Each structure stands twice: as structure tokens, then as C-alpha cells.
Amino acid sequence: MAISERKIFLASSSPRRRELLRQIGVGHELLVLRDAGNRGTDVDETPHDGETPRDYVLRVAIAKAQAGLLVAARRAGGIVKPVLAADTTIALDSIIIGKPDDAEDATRILQALSGRSHVVITAVVIAFAERIETRVSESTVMMSTLDDGLIRRYIATGEPMDKAGAYAVQGRAAAFISRIEGSYSGIMGLPLAETVELLAAFNIESV
């Protein structure tokens, strides 16, 4: 179907989230919370002591949506549309695993995930004025056993470097994911069933 008019702001630079919104026919305008000059609105993405992976990802997604409202208000002269934000993290034995800092960190993460199942948690939030609605998607991913050579070659592609858990389910990593239980789109970064529910709550049509 044709993409609808731009009814929401998307507070995310993720091309995967933009692609998924287009997939369900939702037009949107991109909000950049922090530009190339490192100017913008800060969001604390550091896990807090005692914070569960679910609480962490929900807190960060809400903070992104709230920051997006501020950016949108400044940019649009006070005329604001609903802001959609999301955040994804990996939980391995309830330990939060985010994006790798560098190739060495990506190696460590993939070695930890190798041959084991882990949980991918994505929170999606829509904020408008004083209203905030949230949904959380949890999926289980089983990773095949990865030898050091495969990990090294995969990291050399650059694909893991901006991904939670150091892999992209829709990319080359699909070759070593043996089983998924849950939301494929949620693992990509935007659970579409939950997103459609949120959009409907704000009377925004999709699909």
C-alpha cells in the first residue's frame, strides 16, 4: 500500500526501524536526538544498578520519546506530532548486553552468545503531549556454535558494530541463528504487532 502522510515523528536513526514503519504503511519524519557534531538531547543509556533488562529497555525508550518531544517542539515551532521511539537490548542470563564498543567487545559478546539461547527485548513508546503509551516485546533467539574464524570474519564485515548483541538478524547473522521464538520484527528493533497497537491507541492508521 502507499505510504501515508507523515503522521508521526520517529526518534531513531535506525534504518531498520524506518524500513519497518514503511512496511506497515506509516509515514514518518525523522528526529535526530544528537547530530554529527554531537549536539542535541542526552539520553542516559547506562544500565542502573539492580535494573532488569526489561526495566532498562523501557526506561531508555521512554527517555528517547520524551527527548524527541523536546526536539520536535523546538524544530516545529511548538506544533508537535506523536513521537515514536524504541530501544532494544539483549539479555543473557539476565545480564544486559548492548552494542559493542569495538571489535574486541563484539568478539567477547559473540563468544558469549555462541551455542546458547538469549532473549531480545524491545520496548516501543509513543508520546504525545502528556500522554505516554508503551509496549514491550520479548523474543528468544538460539545461536549456533560459532568458531573463532567465523566470528572474526563476521566482525570484519562491520555489521555487528551498531547492533545490540553484536549481530543483525536480518543480515549475515541469519546464517547462524538456528531458532527464533517470538517477534522477528522485534528482534530487528521494532515489534510491528505492538507498534500497530500503539498507533491505533493514538488513532493513527497503519497496514
Spans of features found by a protein language model:
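Acidic/polar active-site rim loop that often engages polyanionic ligands
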Residues: 40-46, 92, 130-137
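Short, active-site-adjacent cap segments at secondary-structure transitions
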Residues: 17, 89-92, 97, 127, ...
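N-terminal polybasic phosphate/anion-binding patch
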Residues: 1-82, 95, 196, 200-207
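Residue-level signal for inorganic ion chemistry
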Residues: 21, 61, 87, 106, ...
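Mobile beta-alpha loop/short-helix "lid" or hinge segments that flank ligand
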Residues: 27-40, 123-131, 162-174
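GST superfamily/GST-like fold recognition
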Residues: 1-26, 116, 138-207
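Anionic-ligand binding region
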Residues: 107-113, 123-134, 138-139
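Active-site-adjacent loop/tail segments of enzyme domains
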Residues: 88-118, 143
